[in-house]
From Swiss-Prot:
It is an enzyme of class 5 (isomerase). GO terms for cellular component: lipid droplet. Belongs to the terpene cyclase/mutase family. One of its GO terms (biological process) is triterpenoid biosynthetic process. This is Beta-amyrin synthase. Pfam families: SQHop_cyclase_C, SQHop_cyclase_N.
Length: 759
């Protein structure tokens, strides 16, 4: 039986931590664990997911929940609440519904104070890891039999009805993910016609019907070339010399978005080496299975710009293809021949590997994310198969693995700090401190222990890094990468706790550490007033024309985001109230400029585009929260009035809100089909309207939304899992499994606290 382990490092000599692994979450299989009843419960969860997999595609993340609830002997003791049609919501009923969800959610807190949860959904995360450990000869060690069983379960359970796999679990089938998951099944041990429900045969048919893997997008071409089932001459160049360019050039690594930089860093190393894994009998078979013409007759040069229409979200402009062609025809032949291969290419590979090692060490070998992790790990193995660098990477693979009723998947990297920051604010909003003091103390302890205490090591600016001291990451302290909105939410939590008695919530954070957080936030504001996420924005927008991916948008440079800007306003307004003498003028200017930015990016229909959640509902919740924190109201702010009109206009017949993930790639509001509502979207919209003072004008829309949430609460105090709610880079969705608890809880808390209700 699978069990989650919290804040454990084990005895691996290649594993180390900055804070004794606080926030770390890993899974292990224990064949002796669990009672027959517990095992039956897990199996029932798997079967229920499989039966409903085409209706609700994100999992309920039930395995660890069942484990925690069992370990704590949880039993819901508060009677369920039902609000009938036409019945008003009393303060007593709102309180009872709120206490039920607080009681349930508190039982899900881990021993170190955070709330574990899946953050996955993209279907291109796991297959490259399987390919990597296959190439390096570590497949059996990393993924023994029970792991393989769960990997296959995940692949089977998320195969679309047409035989393919989408970019993410709710998406239409794409060549990229269909090819990767087909290869993954074959490596794990399925035959060409094997797999549940004829998975392999159906997938291969989809691939052939859509032109074969010559139509796979560029990242797929890279991975297939590495594996040996594609030829490097069919890929566009990724010269490692890029890492030696002078800093005055507009296209320089320091000016790239950090994730883009970190993906193409190891990719360029592997490309520069033209590395190809061992050509095993399986690789020979895949060369026959994945193409519609003989492998040795393919004109690889012609395949470089090919991309299946199903995968194409960002068509490359002509100027970009022209650049690739020039590099391919003129530059690469020179750099790969003597003497330039010895004078320049060799040096470029050394410089690139120096950057890889620096980033690995700075993140305790977690790296910035799962795509980068696997590429950096493979690059370290290519450099030295028996070296410590690779062994340190192996030790951190468990940090990325997650198991649920739909199988084993690879996480983006973990959302421990992000989820916990919002969970704490939701619980604080309940005003039930007397009932959850221990929960709050543990959460406070986790937040304090998760703050990044130092900048990256050495001359970090020469390695294109920004200050991180005082920040919070998205996941845990070991990850090391500062994020502005995570920092703002962490700071806000610490400030809120500082206003409470330490005998209840524990020792307050010292002011100097709060000042460090403020330094990070102030350093990330752009000239337009907006806040970037990881590093200062400011590179020229035209560089996005060089976006080398086909299925993402806005990935080349750092941008400003409504969510980051709003979170920072919230935090700095509260900080200014508690510490009025610290950098007052700078903070005042920050807030004024940030508000101006929010008002400037509002869409014509009154919403804000959400960059990290679905979509206009999410962005509008953040924006209205930021505006309200800065003193804007419905009466003195046109943007707020337009936003209220927008939200009221899209409220569904049942009182909720429901937005399709298609809003994200299409950049326009798209409702869920069938007049459906989503409880997370409903919570965001409800809180947004409360920020805008809707209760002072007409509380009816708020009552209708609260009624839907109360009546949707399950018997144990949980809420049902519905559609996917997270997104990144416009076109790829993320499943934040904790959202279904955090946001309805928070919305009910704000509703009970701020909307007048009869006793």
């Amino acid at each position: 039986m699978w069990r989650i382990k919290i804040a454990e490092g084990g005895k691996d000599p290649y594993l180390y931590s900055t804070n004794n692994y606080v926030g770390r979450q890993t899974w292990e299989f224990d064949p002796d664990a669990g009672t027959p009843e517990e095992r039956a419960e897990v199996e029932e969860a798997r079967q229920n997911f499989y039966k409903n997999r085409y209706q609700v595609k994100p999992c309920g993340d039930l395995l660890w929940r069942l484990q925690f609830l069992g370990e704590k002997n949880f039993e819901q003791t508060i009677p369920q609440v039902r609000i009938e049609e036409g019945e008003g919501i009393t303060y007593e009923k709102a309180t009872r519904a709120l206490r039920r969800t607080v009681q349930f959610f508190s039982a899900l807190q881990a021993s170190d104070g955070h709330w574990p949860a899946e953050i996955a959904g993209p279907l291109f995360f796991l297959p490259p890891l399987v390919m990597c450990v296959y190439i390096t000869g570590h497949l059996d060690a990393v993924f023994p039999a029970e792991h393989r069983k769960e990997i296959l379960r995940y692949i089977y359970y998320h195969q679309n009805e047409d035989g393919g796999w989408g970019l993410h679990i709710e998406g239409h089938s794409t060549m990229f993910c269909t090819a990767l998951n087909y290869i993954c099944m074959r490596i794990i041990g399925e035959g060409p016609n094997g797999g549940q429900d004829d998975a392999c045969a159906r997938a291969r048919k989809w691939i052939h019907d859509h032109g074969s893997v010559t139509n796979i997008p560029s990242w797929g071409k890279t991975w297939l070339s590495i594996l040996g089932v594609y030829d490097w001459s069919g890929s566009n160049p990724m010269p490692p010399e890029f890492w030696m360019l002078p800093s005055f050039l507009p296209m320089h690594p320091a000016k790239m978005w950090c994730y883009c930089r970190m993906v193409y860093m190891p990719m360029s190393y592997l490309y520069g080496k033209r590395f190809v894994g061992p050509i095993t009998p399986l690789i020979q078979q895949l060369r026959e299975e994945l193409f519609t013409q003989p492998y040795d007759q393919i004109n690889w040069k012609k395949t470089r710009h090919q991309c299946a229409p199903e995968d194409l979200y960002y068509p490359h402009p002509f100027v970009q293809d022209l650049i690739w062609d020039c590099l391919y025809i003129f530059t690469e032949p020179l750099l790969t021949r003597w003497p330039l291969n010895e004078i320049i290419r060799k040096k470029a590979l050394e410089v690139t590997m120096k950057h890889i090692h620096y980033e690995d060490e700075s993140s305790r070998y977690i790296t910035i994310g799962c795509v980068e992790k696997v590429l950096c790990m493979l690059a370290c193995w290519v450099e030295d198969p028996n070296g410590d660098y690779f062994k340190k990477h192996l030790a951190r693979i468990p940090d990325y693995i997650w198991v649920a009723e739909d199988g084993m998947k690879m996480q983006s990297f973990g959302s421990q700090e992000w989820d916990t920051g919002f969970a704490i604010q939701a619980l604080l909003a309940t005003n039930l401190t007397d009932e959850i003091g221990d929960v709050l103390r543990r959460g406070h302890d986790f937040i304090k222990k998760s703050q990044v205490r130092d900048n990256p090591s050495g001359d970090f600016k020469s390695m294109y890094r920004h200050i991180s001291k005082g920040s919070w990451t998205f996941s845990d302290q070991d990850h090391g990468w500062q994020v502005s909105d995570c920092t703002a939410e962490g700071l806000k939590c610490c400030l809120l706790f500082s206003m409470m008695p330490p005998e209840i919530v524990g020792e307050h954070m010292v002011p100097e550490r709060l000042y460090d957080s403020v330094n990070v936030l102030l350093s990330l504001q752009s000239k337009n007033g907006g806040l970037s996420a990881w590093e200062p924005a400011g590179a020229q927008e035209w560089l996005e024309l060089l976006n080398p991916t086909e299925f993402f948008a806005d990935i080349v440079i750092e941008h400003e985001y409504v969510e980051c800007t709003s979170s920072a306003i919230h935090a700095l307004v509260l900080f200014k109230k508690l510490y009025p003498g610290h950098r007052k003028k700078e903070i005042d200017n920050f807030i004024v400029n940030a508000v101006r930015y929010l008002e400037s990016i509002q869409t014509s229909d009154g919403g804000w585009y959400g960059n990290w959640g679905v979509c206009f509902t999410y962005g509008t919740w953040f924006a209205l929260g930021g505006l309200a924190a800065a003193g804007k109201t419905y009466n003195n702010c046109l943007a707020m009035r337009k936003a209220v009109d927008f939200l009221l206009r899209i409220q569904r017949d049942n009182g909720g809100w429901g937005e399709s993930y298609l809003s994200c790639p299409e950049k326009r509001y798209v409702p869920l089909e069938g007049n459906r509502s989503n409880l997370v979207h409903t919570a965001w919209a409800l809180m947004a309207l409360i920020h805008a003072g809707q209760m002072d004008r007409d509380p009816t829309p708020l009552h209708r939304a609260a009624r839907l949430m109360i009546n949707s609460q399950l018997e144990d105090g949980d809420f049902p899992q519905q559609e996917i709610t997270g997104v990144f880079m416009k076109n790829c969705m993320l499943h934040y499994a904790a959202y279904r608890n955090i946001y309805p809880l928070w919305a009910l808390a704000e509703y009970r606290r701020r909307v007048p209700l009869p006793s």
